């Protein structure tokens, strides 16, 4: 579905599934505010939430596009925002559920992940917001040798483990426990489960 916004005589177009109408309208508002005075910055990267978007000319209109995070193709720009808007929706829902909405810390597609050996080969694993910039992911079973550690960027791992999108903006020192692809609990800095 096309969502259209008129800005200073220019038509901005954003494409997304109808179920993301609220998120699409919010995204258009963000882009509109950015470009109200900056039409010379068309085709410039605009950081927002997990990633970045840009506005490109399309005929006489302007199309809002986003990097292809779903398929890990950062050099490819897509018109359909559904995948990106779903990421935004999930993080906001998690912020509300864990009562951390006003304390969420940005984490971007190029953010570092440190992953312990064998993590995704076991059923039970955890993710720890080590600091504002880094997540550490490891098996819960401490008898499994975590070495060697592997460094990745979020966009390389998150599409295969989309449950990580939900929790990526949680505050520093929060720990999330998983069974398979399901979040089992979210422990705050006082080790209180704020998920259940």
Predicted regions mapped to residue ranges:
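Acidic, proline/glycine-rich low-complexity IDRs
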Residues: 1-196
């Amino acid at each position: 579905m096309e969502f259209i916004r008129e800005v200073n005589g220019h038509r901005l177009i954003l494409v997304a599934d109808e179920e993301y109408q609220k998120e699409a309208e919010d995204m258009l508002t963000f882009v509109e505010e950015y470009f109200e005075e900056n039409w010379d910055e068309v085709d410039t990267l605009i950081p927002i939430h997990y990633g970045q978007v840009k506005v490109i000319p399309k005929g006489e209109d302007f199309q809002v596009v986003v990097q292809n995070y779903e398929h890990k193709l950062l050099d490819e720009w897509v018109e359909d925002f559904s995948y990106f808007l779903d990421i935004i929706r999930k993080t906001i829902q998690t912020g509300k559920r864990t009562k951390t909405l006003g304390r969420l810390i940005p984490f971007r597609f190029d953010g570092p992940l440190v992953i312990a050996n064998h993590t995704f080969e076991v059923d039970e694993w955890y993710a720890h917001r080590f600091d504002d910039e880094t997540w550490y992911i490891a098996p819960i079973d401490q008898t499994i040798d975590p070495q060697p550690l592997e460094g990745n960027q979020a966009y390389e791992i998150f599409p295969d483990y989309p449950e990580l999108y939900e929790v990526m903006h949680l505050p520093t020192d929060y720990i999330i426990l998983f069974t398979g692809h399901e979040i089992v609990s979210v422990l705050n800095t006082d080790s209180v489960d704020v998920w259940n």
